[in-house]
């Protein structure tokens, strides 16, 4: 029978190993998934999302590594999750994220996780709907939590949360969050963690006989939360926070006082609240500051707990201020959204070879969605990939004749021709298409005036490029006829009040149609001009406009070649148009006041895809005058535009996009004052001839412009007020929206300059005092019944909303994209969304939105700051609310782009302060709910700032303050990743680009989770470049072996970079940590180098920063001492040359050793005629490597000097003799004697002098000539080079060390990622010293015995890999079983690590130690310090995560490690410390990569705190039954 047991266990273990699942990349599975494969390991950076798998039964070990995730979710109302791990031989270990989410299910959920042990240092979420009672239990025998556990229900039911094996114990040092849940205590509670009751939650201490640690905390967060304690037990005191505002604390019996004591009492001096039932009482430490009169007795009748009448106490006042313990400060995060729970679609490319042997490329559109029953399905549509080009040519001839009636019958004629030529761009996915639109517009303007003049204007020619890019894919289709008609009429009246009057009535109407093409285009241009000419000279204005046009429609179409009349439900076109035109009006040969106003409007219509579009407006302004005149011009313009389109296919989406950027140059040299008031009302009606619903949109524009110009000798003031109002009407039943626009622009024009030339050309500089802004407010009410619609949208910036959407760009350059599906979403940066509208559903929503965004400006000087604020709020049905507050402080002439990504229940605040001439790109990305982030940015002038602030999986909020210098590119990216401590980062800067950083890391409890703050280098470019700079910044973060607080400063020097042909530049900075609070830490300095790679791309449009970091222990850098010679006399000539370089010794870069060279050349003193012997001595100070001012050239903190003797010679007859005479100088620099401070690199170094010939001055009148040449080299101590350096023994803070030579490392130190990688080395297998069999007790009932053996593979390269086999023997009723587990060391490393002295233990040498990963250094006690890498215990009670070595023979008594007994008769202790890399004691330490260390204790039956015999009997019974069944 015993053999059978061993055989079964062996087979089970082998099956578990063979069928293990390793997840190394992101994976999504939908539907039924079998998890009965054995061990499941999810590696860092990977995630596994399982969706709608009803039963998930883990039969092996579950191990989720740091930075990895496991999601099991249900999206069905009828399918609830059943997740279990019932085996008693395996464990659960989570360092990442585990989420079980069944909140949408209407049936009960069950989460039953048992196992041998449970350890959580990451985040675990258990969520259910709460409509019916659900089961949530974690009942492992060994139970430890140092991370976050969240138990969530939508509403409270009678279900309870059970933690730990009944009557056992749990250790909670993290936080346990309850939301609408009841926790019922069934075990002892150890540790100093926190239980948080959120919403309608209750903490029920059901058995006070199972003690609760006095350091455990209970936090009542909301007014409906409560805490109940069993009354029949010994009296205990519970730490309760947040009591007040109506929540409750009670007992399981009614509160009844005795003769001298009331039912409840509060001690205001101690903060203790006592509740009594006769002689039974319990105490609660609620804190100070409560008013005894506000306590009252109530009944807690919540479900899932005993409802005791008058058994609880409530406090009606607010909660007094009280600091929360650290464990309660960890945030209770919302349930994370699992990848893949929402329908998605994407495209894929398939390449195959057909029967003819040709390669065919096909494109597949893959859609993953659910049907009406909730089942997932995948649809793939395959169609050929088309590679075509689109060429569009538009030629417009504009003829303008102005008949001017004058007293002398002089006729002025103005003509112009404008050509528009378009060019293809990138790879458009249309079929080859060419369309030509020819149009001739004629305009006759009769002008009557009393002034005699004659003028003729030459042709004005402008070119614009029409650029089109599209993401639409379609096959060739034939449209027989397309009819488009568009008429435009304009009535214009002008009234000029001046010395002469003129009335101008102009009527312009044009129409044209184009057919016979898939994409016919129609162009309408309207040009009106009013002029009153009286001038002898002229100035011109060049107006350049850039217009981006975007058209997007959605389509789900049938694809057929050469199909006639194909009906499309949706179509998708992305059209981007950019045009640049320059209008110029030449000098007039007449005198007077001239005002010429030109307006043109172009409309492009794409016919076959039913889309509205779009307007391009260009304007030209010409002002010229030579006399002082006041002119008032008032113009009223009313226009009505109607457009009818005949479209064969219905259109379900419309997009209206406007984007205009204009630049105006005004040249004036006279004094004039004019006032221009223009009012324009436009009504545009578009009526597509389809059966689909139309839409109605009202858009109001209001613009006010004020301009001021001043010249040295004249004064000119122009006041223009333009008010325009236009409406775009598209009729839709029961749906309307209004979008008012309001724009205000004020500009100041600087003094002009007058030239004496006959045709003066003047130039003016524009100073923008206040930027313009745009406001859009929308209020929409939509009631509609819509059938099922699927739309795929691709756009730069657009919004999808049930009620309409509002996206506002600046008034000078703006784009609007509108689309109305049924769900509201916000996308940007070419996002793809798939809104779904259920059939025959009724949606009602109301939305009010206001968005204010500043405009684009350009300036040469800075001005005062103007504040803007904006608020965006949207509410759709029962969806979570989105809120974002942005406050911008921006002066004029700045380019500000703000992008906000919103997800449910997020909040973000950003405050920006930017001077003039700056480009600020701010992106706030909140990835997870319930997080807050505040950022303050202040930037001097002429700076480009890219700031990205995000909170990803963070447990705490962060505050950042950043200021950057002028003319610099600063990139800063800060994330707080799974940290248990708050972080504060402050960046300060001046014009020297000095960045100081202060970081405090309190609890670096998890080595795999790095909290990194990186300050990148400053970038300065004086010349414009077209390169994309990828800045790779590596910064060393110091983590000594005993880490308490870490503070360091960073100093960065801006470097000016000219355009380089190679495009590669390097910048360096140094970082110097401040003194640490730990006595075992030494001050040190690190240096970092940033490399900038140049790529052919626009600098401003695409740049990103990638920051990497490495952990390092005490890091030293080399610095070079410099020499200086004192002046001999005022007549002496001296030249001092000191050159030095610092290089990073932390291994961040693979650089050659830097050589610090300093040379001093001294010219001799001029002597007249005498025999003299001259001796010159130089004295200098050395530099300590831990100097806090390492970035400066100061040489400080080295108080030793050296003297250089100068050899002299007799009279020199010729210059040749000078070369034959040399000298050698020798110096020695000793230690500074400052305790544990790092010493200078030049220590006990006998340097050498290189004798070089030195040219001398004319010595014809001197009897002696002296030449001094002193040159020496100091080698760098970087261990990655073959540096030769010796150091002196020294003592620092009680830490003894001997002289050590720096090593030459032939391989790089393994990084954190390398540690997590398993290496398989080939080599000889040698058995190590072996493990000593440890038999703690005889094979009695409930006893365990463990024995182990180990061996090592030594590869030819010198690395080792260790194996260990552990055999665990368990006995029950004299029947024993064995469990054999084999472990393999996961790191292959070079054995170059040296140990250090550790005086924490004195004991004998343990001969059974496993071969260490480093050299065995005998300590003072004679004990071998062994860094074992064999965690062969199967039961884990983590005692510490620090580096621990196990000392002492296990047969000794009273030995312990980190407070855990190792030599007790009832436990078995193991400790391990995997250590890799290289380390040298002494001055120059290498980087040490230390893996996680653990202490293991297996408890046995020998005391009330261990596993009871009853449980072991039950365990044995279950095993016996399983054996019998097998």
Swiss-Prot record:
Chain residues carrying a lipid of type GPI-anchor amidated asparagine: 1502
Inducing factors: Repressed by HAP43 and in absence of GOA1.
Positions of glycan attachment: 93, 498, 637, 1451, 1463, 1479, 1502, 1506
Chain intervals for the UniProt region annotation (Disordered): 512-541, 1180-1207, 1455-1483
A biological-process GO annotation: cell-substrate adhesion
Regions of compositional bias (Polar residues) in chain numbering: 525-541, 1193-1207
Summary of the knockout phenotype: Leads to decreased adherence of germ tubes to plastic and epithelial cells, but not endothelial cells.
Membrane topology reported for the UniProt record: Lipid-anchor; GPI-anchor
Entry GO terms, CC: cell surface; extracellular region; fungal-type cell wall; side of membrane
The record's account of how the chain is modified after translation: The GPI-anchor is attached to the protein in the endoplasmic reticulum and serves to target the protein to the cell surface. There, the glucosamine-inositol phospholipid moiety is cleaved off and the GPI-$modified mannoprotein is covalently attached via its lipidless GPI glycan remnant to the 1,6-beta-glucan of the outer cell wall layer.
Signal peptide (residue range): 1-20
InterPro entries (UniProt xref): Hyphal-reg_cell_wall_N
This protein's UniProt keywords: Cell wall, Glycoprotein, GPI-anchor, Lipoprotein, Membrane, Secreted, Signal, Virulence
Subcellular localization: Secreted, Cell wall; Membrane
Major localization listed first in the record, in broad terms: secreted
Entry keyword S-adenosyl-L-methionine: no
The keyword Membrane belongs to this UniProt entry's keyword annotation: yes
Highest taxon in the source lineage: Eukaryota
Propeptide residues according to the Swiss-Prot or TrEMBL record: 1503-1526
Reported function: GPI-anchored cell wall protein involved in cell wall organization, hyphal growth, as well as in host-fungal interaction and virulence. Plays a role in adherence to plastic and to host epithelial cells. Promotes the tissue fungal burden during murine vaginal candidiasis. Also increases susceptibility to neutrophil-mediated killing. Furthermore, contributes to the severity of hematogenously disseminated candidiasis in normal mice, but not in neutropenic mice.
Family statement: Belongs to the HYR1/IFF family.
Protein name (Swiss-Prot/TrEMBL): Cell wall protein IFF4
Gene: IFF4
């Amino acid at each position: 029978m015993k053999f059978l047991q061993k055989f079964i266990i062996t087979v089970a273990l082998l099956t578990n190993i063979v069928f293990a699942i390793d997840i190394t990349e992101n994976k999504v599975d939908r539907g039924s998934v079998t998890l009965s494969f054995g061990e499941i390991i999810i590696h860092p950076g990977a995630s596994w999302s399982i969706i709608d798998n009803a039963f998930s039964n883990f039969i092996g070990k579950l191990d989720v590594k740091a930075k990895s995730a496991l999601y099991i979710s249900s999206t069905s109302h009828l399918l609830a999750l059943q997740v279990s791990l019932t085996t008693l031989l395996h464990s659960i270990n989570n360092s990442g994220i585990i989420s079980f989410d069944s909140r949408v299910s209407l049936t009960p959920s069950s989460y039953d996780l048992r196992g041998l042990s449970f350890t959580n240092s990451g985040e675990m979420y258990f969520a259910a709907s709460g409509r019916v009672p659900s089961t949530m239990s974690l009942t492992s025998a060994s139970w430890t939590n140092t991370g976050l556990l969240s138990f969530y229900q939508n509403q409270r039911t009678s279900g309870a949360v059970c933690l730990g094996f009944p009557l056992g114990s749990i250790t909670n040092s993290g936080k346990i969050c309850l939301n609408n849940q009841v926790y019922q205590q069934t075990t002892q509670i150890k540790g100093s963690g926190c239980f948080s009751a959120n919403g309608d939650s209750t903490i029920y201490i059901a058995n006070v006989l199972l003690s609760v640690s006095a350091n455990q905390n209970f936090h009542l967060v909301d007014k409906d939360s409560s805490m109940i304690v069993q009354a029949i037990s010994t009296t205990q005191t519970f730490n309760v926070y947040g009591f007040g505002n109506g929540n409750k604390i009670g007992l399981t019996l009614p509160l009844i006082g005795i003769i001298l004591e009331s039912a409840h009492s509060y001690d205001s001096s101690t903060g203790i609240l006592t509740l009594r039932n006769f002689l039974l009482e319990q105490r609660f430490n609620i804190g100070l500051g409560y008013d005894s009169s506000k306590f009252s007795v109530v009944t807690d009748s919540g479900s899932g707990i005993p409802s005791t009448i008058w058994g609880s106490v409530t406090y009606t006042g607010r909660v007094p201020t009280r600091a929360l313990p650290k464990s309660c400060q960890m945030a209770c995060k919302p349930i994370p959204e699992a990848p893949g729970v929402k329908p998605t679609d994407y495209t894929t490319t398939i390449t195959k070879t057909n029967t003819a042997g040709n390669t065919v490329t096909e494109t597949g559109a893959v859609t993953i969605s659910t049907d009406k029953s909730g089942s997932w399905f995948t649809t793939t549509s395959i169609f050929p990939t088309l590679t075509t080009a689109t060429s569009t040519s538009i030629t417009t001839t504009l003829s303008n004749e102005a008949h001017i009636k004058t007293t002398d019958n002089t006729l002025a004629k103005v003509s112009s021709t404008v050509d528009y030529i378009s060019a293809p761009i990138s790879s458009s996915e249309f079929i080859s298409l060419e369309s030509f639109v020819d149009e001739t517009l004629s305009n006759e303007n009769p002008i009557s005036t009393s002034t005699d003049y004659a003028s003729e204007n030459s042709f004005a020619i402008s070119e614009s490029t029409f650029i089109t890019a599209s993401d639409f894919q379609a096959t060739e289709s034939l449209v027989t006829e397309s009819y488009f008609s568009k008429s435009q009429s304009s009535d214009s009246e002008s009234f000029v009040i001046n010395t002469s009057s003129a009335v101008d009535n102009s009527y312009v109407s044009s129409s044209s149609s184009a057919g016979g093409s898939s994409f016919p285009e129609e162009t309408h241009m309207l040009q009106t001009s009013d002029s009153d000419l009286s001038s002898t000279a002229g100035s011109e204005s060049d107006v350049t406009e850039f217009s981006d046009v975007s058209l997007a429609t959605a389509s789900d179409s049938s694809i057929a070649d050469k199909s006639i009349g194909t009906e499309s439900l949706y179509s998708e076109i992305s059209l981007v148009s950019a045009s640049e035109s320059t209008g110029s009006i030449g000098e007039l040969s007449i005198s007077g006041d001239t005002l010429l106003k030109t307006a043109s409007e172009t409309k492009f219509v794409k016919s076959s895809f039913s889309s509205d579009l779009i307007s391009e407006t260009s304007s030209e302004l010409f002002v010229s005058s030579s006399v002082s005149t006041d002119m008032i011009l008032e113009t009223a313009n009313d226009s009505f535009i109607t457009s009818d389109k005949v479209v064969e296919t219905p259109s379900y989406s419309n997009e209206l996009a406007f984007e205009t950027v204009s630049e105006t140059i005004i040249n004036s040299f006279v004094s004039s004052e004019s006032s221009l008031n223009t009012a324009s009302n436009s009504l545009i009606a578009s009526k597509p001839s389809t059966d689909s619903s139309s839409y109605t949109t009202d858009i109001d524009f209001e613009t006010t412009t004020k301009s001021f110009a001043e010249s040295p000798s004249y004064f000119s003031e122009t006041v223009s007020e333009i008010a325009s109002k236009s409406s775009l009407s598209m009729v839709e039943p029961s749906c309307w929206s209004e979008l008012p626009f309001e724009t205000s622009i004020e500009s100041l024009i600087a003094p002009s300059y007058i030239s004496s030339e006959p045709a003066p050309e003047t130039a003016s500089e524009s100073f923008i005092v206040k930027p313009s802004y745009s406001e859009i407010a929308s209020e929409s009410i939509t009631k509609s019944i819509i059938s099922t619609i699927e739309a795929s949208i691709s756009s730069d910036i657009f919004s999808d909303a049930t009620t309409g959407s509002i996206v506002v760009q600046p008034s000078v350059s703006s784009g609007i994209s509108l689309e109305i599906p049924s769900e509201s979403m916000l996308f940007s940066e070419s996002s793809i969304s798939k809104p779904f509208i259920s059939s025959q559903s009724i949606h009602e929503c109301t939305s009010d939105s206001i968005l204010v965004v500043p405009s684009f400006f350009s300036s040469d000087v800075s001005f005062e700051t103007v504040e803007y604020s904006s608020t965006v709020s949207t509410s759709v049905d029962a969806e979570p609310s989105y809120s974002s507050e942005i406050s911008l402080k921006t002066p004029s002439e700045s380019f500000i782009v703000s992008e906000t990504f919103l997800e449910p229940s997020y909040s973000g605040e950003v405050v920006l302060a930017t001077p003039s001439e700056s480009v600020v790109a701010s992106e706030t990305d909140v990835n997870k709910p319930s997080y807050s982030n505040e950022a303050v940015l202040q930037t001097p002038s002429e700076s480009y700032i890219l700031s990205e602030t995000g909170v990803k999986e963070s447990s705490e909020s962060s505050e950042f303050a950043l200021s950057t210098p002028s003319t610099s590119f600063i990139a800063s990216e800060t994330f707080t990743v799974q940290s248990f401590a708050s972080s504060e980062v402050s960046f300060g800067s001046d014009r020297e680009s000095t960045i100081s950083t202060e970081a405090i890391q309190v609890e670096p409890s998890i080595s795999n989770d790095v909290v990194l703050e990186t300050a990148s280098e400053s970038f300065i470019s004086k010349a414009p470049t077209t390169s994309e700079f990828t800045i790779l910044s590596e910064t060393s973060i110091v983590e000594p072996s005993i880490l308490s607080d870490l503070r360091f400063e960073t100093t960065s020097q801006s470097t000016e970079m000219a355009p380089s042909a190679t495009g590669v530049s390097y910048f360096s900075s140094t970082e110097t940590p401040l003194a640490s609070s730990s006595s075992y830490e030494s001050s040190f300095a690190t240096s970092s180098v940033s490399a900038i790679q140049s790529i052919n791309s626009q600098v401003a449009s695409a740049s990103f920063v990638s920051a990497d970091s490495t952990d390092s222990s005490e890091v030293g850098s080399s610095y070079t001492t410099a020499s200086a010679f004192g002046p001999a006399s005022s007549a002496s000539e001296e030249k001092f040359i000191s050159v030095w370089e610092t290089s990073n010794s932390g291994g961040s870069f693979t650089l050659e050793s830097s050589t610090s060279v300093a040379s001093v050349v001294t010219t001799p003193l001029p002597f007249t005629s005498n025999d003299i012997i001259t001796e010159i001595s130089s004295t200098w100070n050395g530099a300590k490597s831990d100097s806090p001012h390492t970035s400066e050239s100061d040489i400080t903190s080295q108080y030793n000097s050296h003297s250089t003797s100068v050899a002299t010679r007799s009279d020199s007859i010729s210059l040749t003799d000078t070369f034959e005479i040399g000298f050698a100088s020798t110096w020695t620099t000793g230690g500074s004697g400052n305790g544990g401070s790092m010493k200078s690199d030049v220590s006990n170094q006998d340097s050498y002098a290189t004798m070089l010939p030195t040219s001398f001055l004319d010595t014809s009148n001197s009897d002696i000539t002296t030449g001094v040449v002193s040159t020496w080299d100091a080698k760098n101590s970087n261990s990655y080079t073959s540096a030769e350096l010796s150091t002196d023994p020294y003592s620092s803070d009680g830490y003894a060390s001997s002289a050590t030579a720096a090593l030459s490392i032939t391989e790089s130190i393994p990084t954190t990622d390398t540690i997590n990688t398993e290496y398989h080395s080939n080599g000889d297998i040698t058995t190590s010293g072996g493990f000593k069999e440890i038999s703690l007790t005889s094979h009695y009932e409930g006893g365990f015995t463990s024995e182990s053996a180990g061996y090592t593979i030594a590869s030819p390269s010198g690395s080792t890999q260790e194996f260990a086999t552990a055999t665990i023997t368990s006995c029950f009723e004299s029947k024993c079983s064995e469990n054999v587990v084999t472990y393999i060391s996961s790191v292959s490393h070079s054995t170059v690590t040296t140990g250090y002295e550790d005086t924490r233990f004195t004991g004998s040498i343990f001969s059974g130690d496993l071969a260490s990963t480093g050299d065995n250094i005998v300590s003072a006690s004679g004990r071998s310090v062994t860094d074992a890498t064999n965690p062969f215990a199967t039961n884990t009670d983590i005692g510490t995560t620090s580096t621990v070595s196990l000392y002492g023979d296990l047969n000794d008594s009273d030995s312990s490690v980190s407070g855990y007994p190792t030599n007790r008769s009832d436990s078995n202790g193991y400790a391990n410390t995997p250590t890799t890399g290289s380390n040298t004691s002494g001055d120059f330490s290498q980087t040490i990569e230390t893996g996680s260390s653990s202490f293991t204790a297996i408890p046995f039956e020998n005391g009330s705190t261990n596993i009871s015999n009853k449980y072991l009997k039950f365990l044995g019974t279950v095993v016996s039954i399983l054996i019998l069944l097998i």
